């Protein structure tokens, strides 16, 4: 008998307060790393009603105009009017960033140009054949919905929308394969004078139907559009925002484990970020090579230690060879030292603001080098699976 279940993932718009915090942290990182590629950055942002606080640690030779960066990000997101509950012009900005501890730095910067891991930790990467970008279907569709909410707002298609918003997608699986979308939840901030029925109809017509393929929509699909009935107060006025509080949205929507480390505001010597990008790169290339239909990759590090302390590959029973051979392949073909990851993926560039909304994985932008499948042929040759 066919095994059937429902699986749900969510995404949030760039105007969600937690995502605002992520984008501010990464905008600061980009500004610094563009001028000082060897900088060490750990930048955290807190947003609340009318103010932003920047905290963390830096080791850099450059100066970053924190207030200007923060205000520009808020403006670009769309908080340009006090009526929205947050305004880039009037928001207070407090800079509490300090210097990086020399105790940490001596373990990261090592003799001979080697880089030790910036902290201990474990990271996961994942890939599967549910979508053309080798990502799970629920998180892929959720991201497309939230991105279209922002597009419709910025392009004036739905001028009554405001920046804050969320989407959630529930997918029916049969024997492990996605079949239909059964439920879509969308909550979007809006002007106070738009009627509920107009908003609901417009969101389904201009957002859902525009990005969700018709063949995926179940005949009995349920839509929950602003299910509370009203969403005028939003953004940092409605909820505080913090860097690193949307780690499942940032990754795979719950389809695989998460090591717990956030990404935004961290330079690539922090393996929370670069290790997770490398794990995605490995997993995606394993699947693209034809070695397996699905791959979960775990990498773990110790602070100040160059080589990973462990590498694990789980093909979920879909591989053409034993998982031990996949692990040997990964060890032989991928340099998973912090320095090796930074070099392979070209991570000392100002590319991080783009990652901070709508997912770090599954978007094949030129800057997202971890999405390339340039190792697939090498893997298939190594495993002799052609």
Curated annotation (Swiss-Prot):
K(+) binds at residue 44. It holds the Pfam family S-AdoMet_synt_M. GO terms for cellular component: cytoplasm. It comes from Nitratiruptor sp. (strain SB155-2). Binds 2 divalent ions per subunit. This is S-adenosylmethionine synthase. Belongs to the AdoMet synthase family. Its cofactor is Mg(2+); K(+). InterPro entries: ADOMET_SYNTHASE_CS, S-AdoMet_synt_C, S-AdoMet_synt_central, S-AdoMet_synt_N, S-AdoMet_synthetase, S-AdoMet_synthetase_sfam. Mg(2+) binds at residue 18. L-methionine binds at residues 57, 100, 239, 270. It catalyses: L-methionine + ATP + H2O = S-adenosyl-L-methionine + phosphate + diphosphate. Pathway: Amino-acid biosynthesis; S-adenosyl-L-methionine biosynthesis; S-adenosyl-L-methionine from L-methionine: step 1/1. Its EC number is 2.5.1.6. GO terms for molecular function: ATP binding; magnesium ion binding; methionine adenosyltransferase activity. Catalyzes the formation of S-adenosylmethionine (AdoMet) from methionine and ATP. The overall synthetic reaction is composed of two sequential steps, AdoMet formation and the subsequent tripolyphosphate hydrolysis which occurs prior to release of AdoMet from the enzyme.
């Amino acid at each position: 008998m066919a095994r059937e279940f429902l699986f749900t993932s969510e995404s949030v718009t760039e105007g969600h307060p937690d995502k605002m915090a992520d984008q501010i942290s990464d905008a600061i990182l980009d500004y610094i790393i563009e001028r000082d590629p060897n900088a060490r950055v750990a930048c955290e942002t807190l947003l609340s009603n009318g103010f932003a606080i920047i905290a963390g640690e830096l080791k850099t030779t450059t100066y970053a105009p924190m207030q200007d960066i923060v205000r520009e990000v808020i403006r670009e997101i769309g908080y340009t009017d006090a009526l929205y509950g947050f305004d880039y012009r009037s928001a207070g900005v407090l800079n509490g960033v300090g210097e990086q501890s020399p105790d940490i730095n001596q373990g990261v910067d090592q003799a001979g140009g080697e880089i030790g891991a910036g902290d201990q930790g474990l990271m996961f990467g994942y890939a599967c054949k549910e979508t053309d970008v080798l990502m799970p279907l629920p998180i892929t569709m959720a991201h497309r919905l939230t991105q279209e909410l922002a597009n419709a707002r910025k392009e004036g298609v739905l001028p009554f929308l405001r920046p804050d918003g969320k989407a959630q997608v529930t997918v029916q699986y049969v024997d492990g394969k996605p079949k239909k979308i059964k439920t879509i939840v969308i909550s979007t901030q809006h002007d106070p004078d738009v009627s509920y029925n107009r908003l609901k109809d417009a969101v389904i017509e201009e957002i859902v139907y525009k990005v969700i393929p018709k063949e995926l929509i179940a005949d009995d699909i349920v839509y929950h559009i602003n299910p509370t009935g009203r969403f005028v107060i939003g953004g940092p006025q409605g909820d505080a925002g913090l860097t690193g509080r949307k780690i499942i949205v940032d990754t795979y929507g719950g389809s695989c484990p998460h090591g717990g480390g956030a990404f935004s505001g961290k330079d690539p010597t922090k393996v929370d970020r670069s290790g997770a990008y490398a794990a995605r790169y490995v997993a995606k290339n394993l699947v693209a090579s034809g070695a397996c239909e699905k791959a979960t990759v775990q990498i773990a590090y110790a602070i100040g230690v160059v080589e990973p302390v462990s590498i694990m590959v789980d093909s979920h029973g879909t591989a053409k060879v034993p998982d031990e051979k996949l692990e040997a392949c990964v060890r032989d073909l991928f340099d998973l030292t912090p320095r090796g990851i930074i070099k392979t993926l070209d991570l000392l560039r100002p590319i991080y603001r783009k990652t901070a909304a709508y997912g770090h994985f599954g978007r094949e932008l030129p800057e997202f080098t971890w999405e390339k499948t340039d190792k697939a042929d090498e893997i298939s040759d190594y495993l002799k699976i052609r």
